[in-house]
């Protein structure tokens, strides 16, 4: 990417083999380098003990592409929110979400976000640039290193709109799958919807989970919540989602943040059900996490259950996802650079 320093992280085993050969080393060093980068997670080439000492010394300042943790907050449920400093000093956020059987990483795809969703803390902080493939992969390796256990799942639900950085996101998906060793079906790409990009993603024929942040079943309300929806009318968005299912053979997950008194009314549940009838899909209802910058409220339990029941009555597959890491300001929609607020 323009202006970004080339790093070893983000390269495939073939590319790494080409690189070591350019350095005058035998081809087998490429596989060694690949293993130490992606399986051992080294932060400096001097750590690669199988390399000749003299060569390691030559490479001591060569950029791998690893970030530094500048802050980590741990919630009572052991969710960890990280502020990571990139090579150019910009700060991004990453979240590690552990359970007894899983370790999920919520990765950022951009520094900030240009979509400016009305209820989201990240969008209030503006947008700076796209992340590189290496900067995305690094987030997973950093969380894996900090937890001292393998990452099992990755969700592209952190800072940024993944489909606005699709080239680097696709590269990161392939590296995470083929090089880090995470199954594609354990990777989730989420979007609020970007014209033409859903079908572009579909034609890559990935086996990832695809999630669309819907949040409203009528265009007027959706534009209020998601300003970018003005350029992507709901009927066209849903039509593209249906084409995605046809092309990939995989269902679409619809994320629906429940905002008390705004989009959680019974008639809105019926409206959503009608939009999705006959659709190969699943709905994730997410009770809102209040932020200082937006005047929305979390719905009560009765409203949540009522909305879920309406969808179930219409034979819509639905579940309620309660966000982890609330105490760490790390839950869905609350990702923002705390350092920016201090400056």
From Swiss-Prot:
One of the GO biological process terms: rRNA base methylation
Pfam families registered for this protein in UniProt: Radical_SAM, RlmN_N
GO MF terms, alphabetically ordered: 4 iron, 4 sulfur cluster binding; metal ion binding; rRNA (adenine(2503)-C2-)-methyltransferase activity; rRNA binding; tRNA (adenine(37)-C2)-methyltransferase activity; tRNA binding
Reported cofactor(s): [4Fe-4S] cluster
Residues binding S-adenosyl-L-methionine: 160-161, 190, 213-215, 289
Location of the protein in the cell: Cytoplasm
Cofactor detail note: Binds 1 [4Fe-4S] cluster. The cluster is coordinated with 3 cysteines and an exchangeable S-adenosyl-L-methionine.
Residues annotated as catalytic: 93, 332
Catalytic activity annotation: adenosine(2503) in 23S rRNA + 2 reduced [2Fe-2S]-[ferredoxin] + 2 S-adenosyl-L-methionine = 2-methyladenosine(2503) in 23S rRNA + 5'-deoxyadenosine + L-methionine + 2 oxidized [2Fe-2S]-[ferredoxin] + S-adenosyl-L-homocysteine; adenosine(37) in tRNA + 2 reduced [2Fe-2S]-[ferredoxin] + 2 S-adenosyl-L-methionine = 2-methyladenosine(37) in tRNA + 5'-deoxyadenosine + L-methionine + 2 oxidized [2Fe-2S]-[ferredoxin] + S-adenosyl-L-homocysteine
InterPro entries documented for this protein: Aldolase_TIM, Methyltransferase_A, RlmN_N, RNA_MTrfase_RlmN, rRNA_lsu_MTrfase_RlmN/Cfr, rSAM
Cystine connections: 106-332
Radical SAM core domain residues: 99-327
Positions with a binding annotation for [4Fe-4S] cluster: 113, 117, 120
Enzyme Commission designation: 2.1.1.192
Gene Ontology CC annotation, any one: cytoplasm
Keywords, sorted A to Z: 4Fe-4S, Cytoplasm, Disulfide bond, Iron, Iron-sulfur, Metal-binding, Methyltransferase, rRNA processing, S-adenosyl-L-methionine, Transferase, tRNA processing
Enzyme class: transferase
PANTHER family linked to this entry: 23S RRNA METHYLTRANSFERASE (PTHR30544), RADICAL SAM CORE DOMAIN-CONTAINING PROTEIN (PTHR30544:SF5)
Similarity remark: Belongs to the radical SAM superfamily. RlmN family.
Note: Reaction proceeds by a ping-pong mechanism involving intermediate methylation of a conserved cysteine residue.
Cited function: Specifically methylates position 2 of adenine 2503 in 23S rRNA and position 2 of adenine 37 in tRNAs.
Stated name of the protein: Probable dual-specificity RNA methyltransferase RlmN
Encoding gene, per UniProt annotation: rlmN
